[in-house]
Amino acid sequence: MLTPLTPSERRAALWLAATAVLVLAAGFGLRDPWPADEPRFVLVAKQMVESGDWLFPQRGSELYPDKPPFYFWLLALAGLATGSWRWSFLLPSLLAGLGTLWLVFDLARRLWDVRAGLWAATAVLVVPAFVYQAKRAQIDPTLVFLTTLALYGILRHLLLGPAWRWFAGGCFAAGLGVISKGVGFLPLLALLPFAWMRWR
């Protein structure tokens, strides 16, 4: 059972959250999509919204089979929610980055303590590649979030459980990861600890 955060722990967590938002959201809405991938991804999502065809991504009049549709669905939903492609095209990556940080913090807090959670999330936030990708309209932040969520759910079940809802959620996240990118098999690797535990 988790103990409530002390006032100093709560302040530290809020400082980390504010820093994460400041770092990841800096410049949000102030730029247009940058070549090579961002304009293409936004165009595919925009075409989904305009045509109503959400199953088969298209670029112009051509089918766009290069990537699975899940990320384009997120971009399209963000565009519908904000009404502005300039404000929406970075939203899935921003939310995925913040979600990944929260999952890392919460899992470390549950396994050890709040201090470990703060250090773990800080360690992720200072990785240049993480920040770089979270500030771009790329599929990778979404894949990282889904992979982290898959591991989070499975580890909550295996190490802190039984927690079958979290296990099912982790498996579902692994499945979404599979349809998010061409190398989507990576989230399925999250199932290896469970298979190992069952085999033992």
Question: Which residues does each predicted region cover?
Answer:
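Membrane-integral, polyisoprenol-dependent glycosyltransferases
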Residues: L2-R200
